[in-house]
Regions:
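N-terminal periplasmic "start-of-domain" segments of outer-membrane beta-barrel proteins
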Residues: 26-57, 85, 93-96, 103
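Short acidic/polar hinge/loop motifs at secondary-structure boundaries
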Residues: 103-131, 183
Length: 679
């Protein structure tokens, strides 16, 4: 199938100055923005990569993650073709820290990974990725630190108006009403005041078809691969809307004192319809070849999910700079907030299962063909083909109402921080240097409130006006699916259904994390280089509360102190070539989900399984070594070669015990938790 993607871009930048007679229309190309990024990278005293200014809009990037991936050592994890999580040097996104204008971004999922697919590039002026750390940066950055910055009024020379409008056409989508526009207005109203306002809106429809086989592949006694778990075919039809604004203002109150404010707000709405055809409990019998197998069981689930998820990220800063007794003094008070709202989610599953010599949803033929109910061909493991000997499993009248799941969940993550920095020009060994010290206090709170209700009914899919989807992969059968409007309406019809269970507190928890940090550092200009070194100390106190299986509150707490020395050296080999070396210690704290004292249960007959959090987890700790050579040639040519080594202790991973007793609950079918590797 041919696919077409067409983009229409209409950028316009107007800049006027007070002494100009007419307005100028200035087109700033990739060259100008590339010069700015390379200059900043070259002048930095640590190892960084930078995307600057209009380069963010030169490509059809939808999200901030997609803009970052153009930098060396950066990869991203996509969702529905859009960049979502960022990996620095191949490490988990949980091991990064991300900030907007200096305010650390929270993560509205209960972990440390920050979702970036809701953050549009139009709101940003530059992105800086730090791969080595200095003591004035937060230590929780084993992977690295990503700083997003909006346009500052101090960069203005006059009035600025920037407008961008684009759209796209995609043959896969049902609708091509995909507008995206952004406007930036700024003005330096006087020698003492300037401000910048930005606004952006976009809407994009995405349609996708995929096959998923999970981790069900095993090697049998003959050394052949076979699928012994499940396989899914999925269809997505979703619309993603992004709305955001920024406001920055700068006040010069005297020759040595300035105050600034910064506000950032972004809202992301994901309106999703998902059809899923799942074939589970597949068991190999009889002949298995390199490309196929017989199965004595097929569990066919047809699922319709209608969901609208809203994510919000906000950051607010007020700060200033002045001189006190020859010390340049800076302060910043920041508040950041993230929320994930899943209060509009309906998921309905229908099931028809056939099993050899056991109860089935359809009458089995007698005798069975080789004791099998079907055959699976996996000559193409990315696109399996099921030959069911019982096509009745696709009949809506045989697909019985299995379960309706309604979710009403909200996750909130917020952080308040205050930092003070003091620096002064001095001499060390006859060389100019800058002494700097400071302190920072951060208080973070994560509040998870998940509510799920499960319902049963005696109807079949035939009662939900099913329809057949056009499936693009030859040989595969995608069954009919329930009408999504009727599924969505069930949220207001629960009185006519049978309540099968509720989860109102089992996954709920609240965690508070307080971090106090102090640091000292020195930056010395040497004859052929720059040396930056110092130490940072961070003390963390964490407290968390949840509920046990009876609804009684449980509490847990932990604390630790971390010492983080670092040294960065930039050596000038010649006018165009730099050698950089760096050493630092850093950490990454466990996810909130893994440390909260949450005990989740799943009871099936006499079998009890579940998972629980481990408040005693230690953070990842890492010794980081870096070396790189950078060449800056003429005509914007740039070349760098680097290597790094990270020695990471206290790695965190999941473990499963077959039996265990926790908080009075005896598990006999497996219990999952998190532990440190040294344990």
């Amino acid at each position: 199938m041919k696919k077409y993607l067409i983009l229409f871009l209409v950028p316009l930048t107007l800049i006027s100055q007070e002494d100009a007679l007419v307005e100028e229309v200035i087109v700033v190309g990739t060259k100008a923005s590339l010069i700015a990024a390379i200059d900043k990278q070259r002048e930095s005293d640590k190892i960084v990569s930078i995307v600057d200014s209009d380069a963010l809009g030169d490509f059809p990037d939808t999200t901030a993650a997609e803009a970052i991936r153009r930098l060396s050592g950066i990869s991203i994890e996509n969702d529905q073709g859009e960049g979502r999580y960022v990996s620095i040097r191949g490490l988990s996104s949980d091991l990064n820290s991300i900030a907007i204008n200096g305010a650390l971004m929270p993560a509205p999922e209960g972990n440390r990974s920050v979702l970036l697919d809701g953050l549009p590039t139009e709101l940003l002026d530059s992105i800086e990725v730090s791969k080595s750390l200095t003591p004035d940066q937060d230590a929780d950055s084993i992977g690295g630190r990503i700083d997003f910055k909006t346009k500052r009024p101090t960069d203005l020379t006059g009035e600025l108006i920037k407008i961008k409008i684009d759209t796209q056409y995609n043959e896969q989508a049902k609708s091509n009403d995909n507008p995206r526009f952004a406007i930036t207005y700024g003005d330096k109203l006087s020698d003492t005041f300037g401000h910048v306002l930005g606004f952006t809106y976009s809407s994009k429809q995405i349609v996708s078809y995929n096959n998923e086989t999970g981790f069900g592949w095993e090697t049998n006694s003959e050394g052949l691969k076979e699928l012994n778990d499940d396989w899914e075919m999925r269809y997505y039809d979703l619309t993603r809307e992004r709305l955001g604004f920024t406001y920055d203002a700068n006040f010069l109150t005297s020759d040595v004192t300035s105050i600034y404010i910064s506000a950032f707000h972004n809202e992301y709405i994901d309106d999703e319809l998902r059809y899923k055809d799942e074939y589970g409990k597949l068991g190999s019998i009889g002949t298995t070849t390199q490309s196929s197998m017989f199965t004595d069981r097929i569990r066919h689930d047809a699922e319709t999910r209608v969901r609208e998820e809203t994510r919000t990220i906000s950051a607010f800063n007020i700060g200033g700079e002045t001189i006190i007794n020859d010390w340049n003094s800076e302060f910043q008070l920041s508040y950041s907030f993230a929320e994930q709202d899943d209060t509009d989610n309906a998921d309905l599953t229908f099931r028809c299962e056939v099993r050899a010599k056991k109860d089935s949803c359809v009458n089995l033929k007698s005798p069975l063909v080789s004791g099998a109910v079907g055959e699976i061909n996996f000559s193409n493991p990315r696109k399996l083909v099921l030959n069911s000997y019982y096509p009745e499993i696709y009949d809506p009248a045989n697909l019985k109402f299995k379960e309706l799941e309604l979710e009403d969940s909200i996750i909130e993550d917020s952080e308040t921080a205050l930092k003070l920095d003091f620096s002064k020009d001095i001499e060390v060994g006859g060389n100019p240097a800058v002494a700097k010290f400071g302190l920072k206090y951060r208080s973070r709170e994560v509040d998870v409130d998940k509510n799920k209700s499960f319902y049963e009914d005696d109807r079949t899919m035939a009662d939900f006006n099913p329809s057949q989807l056009s499936w693009p992969f030859p040989g595969q059968v995608f069954s009919q699916q329930a009408n999504p409007a009727l599924v969505y309406a069930l949220q207001n019809q629960t009185d006519s259904l049978t309540l099968d269970g509720q989860e109102t507190y089992l996954e709920d928890y609240k965690t508070t994390e307080d971090i106090f940090a102090v640091y000292g550092m020195l930056t010395s200009d040497l004859e052929n280089g720059v040396l930056t070194y110092g130490v940072r100390v961070e003390k963390m106190d964490m407290s968390s509360s949840a509920f046990d299986q009876d609804g009684n509150p449980t509490k847990a707490s932990s604390d630790h102190t971390f010492v983080a020395p670092s040294i960065n050296y930039k050596h000038f080999i010649n006018e165009n070539t730099l050698l950089r070396t760096a050493y630092s210690r850093s950490l990454s704290r466990p996810s909130f989900n893994s440390t909260a004292p949450v005990l989740e249960l799943e009871i099936t007959g006499e079998d009890i399984k579940g998972k629980y959090g481990n408040p005693d987890l230690d953070p990842y700790e890492s010794d980081n070594f870096d070396i790189s050579i950078e060449y800056y040639g003429n005509n914007l040519s740039y070349l760098s070669v680097g290597a790094f080594l990270k020695k990471i202790d206290n790695a965190i991973y999941k473990t499963i015990q077959k039996t265990a007793t926790i908080n009075g609950v005896s598990f006999n079918d497996g219990v999952e938790t998190w532990i440190n590797a040294e344990d």
